[in-house]
Amino acid sequence: MLAATSIIAEAERTVGIADSDACVRGNLERLVDSLNREFPMSPKGEMMVRSTLLMDSVNRLQGLKWLQDHPEIAAEPIEDPVFLMGLPRSGTTYFQYLFDRDRRFRLIRTWESSMPSPPPGSDPESVTRRRAAWIELQKARGHFEGFEALHLYDDDGSDECHAFLEQSYGAAGLHNLYRVPTYFDWLMDELDLVQTYRIHKRQLQLLQWRSERKPWALKYPNHVIGLNEILEVHPDARFVMTHRDPAQVLASISKMTHNLRSRRCAGPVDMHEVGRDMLHFIQRHVDRIMTFDRGPFGHRVIHIDYYALIADPVREMRMMHRGLGIDTPDDVGEAVSAWCAANPKNARGRNDYSLAQYGLDAASVAERFTAYMRRFDVPPEREGLARAGTLPSGPVHAGNPGSNDPVSAP
């Protein structure tokens, strides 16, 4: 059985300071309770989960220690950050990799997300060591079969914000890694996301300290659940949101979730249970998107059509840049074009899945998300791919076997 108290205590001993983030212990207790009751872990799986949760607290406390020793870090400005988001599997990672071609922005690197200390600006020589250590760690861990087709990832590429949000145990994506439905609903309804994003900001300040200041581009699909909280922490935040057929999103996130949970679960993962969990998961994300859109700050979101993005990435980047009030230099457009040419669709394998595999009915799913699709002019997958000129030869509806993602990994 996992125990929140022992995890925090071990992290405190490892770093040598007391945990002063008052909100975090309660978040971890809720998560651990849900894990112990709702997610039967194999012995190896439980070790993996505990190791990850411990690393989260160690990384957070190391950041706190740096702040204690160098209080000027708290004054480090995080100016005009761009938050990249959208429903999970709606092209956010693809868009992040395009964004990474623009050197005017700072993105989190893969090794930084899991090994953020010491701050790179304070110990530049450690960067090379940590990069190499991260690559070796990934080789040792391995990925599930088909991972590269399902998720775009490079060992030395840009990374999302999950690890920084997980430092406070406030990351919605934990429900994809582990089955924790009670924790997920508590996160959505009660967890203090303002504190979660303050800890997230603190980590950005640490990475930026004594380094060149650039606007941050911060990708995490699940940022959509905390837009108001992000604005409380970052009043000058800018938002970019991708949109894709929710039926396709749902089938794809179900496959990803099934594979991730299977690595830690004691027995076979019930695919229909995954489908039910993810239907609720996506519904709650859509509800947050729609609620924010109707609110006073809905106009601050730049909306990106997934199908337009894969049809003409440079055009969509130019449109997005106009929304941000900046130009698109020729070298950025050329870099985006070159990256797309080097990473053609299905280059890392096909990604096959269907709603039916997860016990979901395509017609009822489509009906459930009609209002969202109408509001953001999101076409059904087949229509969108046809419009983009990327329609494969086989069936391409999430309700039928043989569906695939037209880019390597959204």
Describe every region a protein language model picked out.
Residues M1-K65, E72, P181-Y197, L204-S211, ...:
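PAPS-dependent sulfotransferases, especially Golgi type II membrane carbohydrate sulfotransferases
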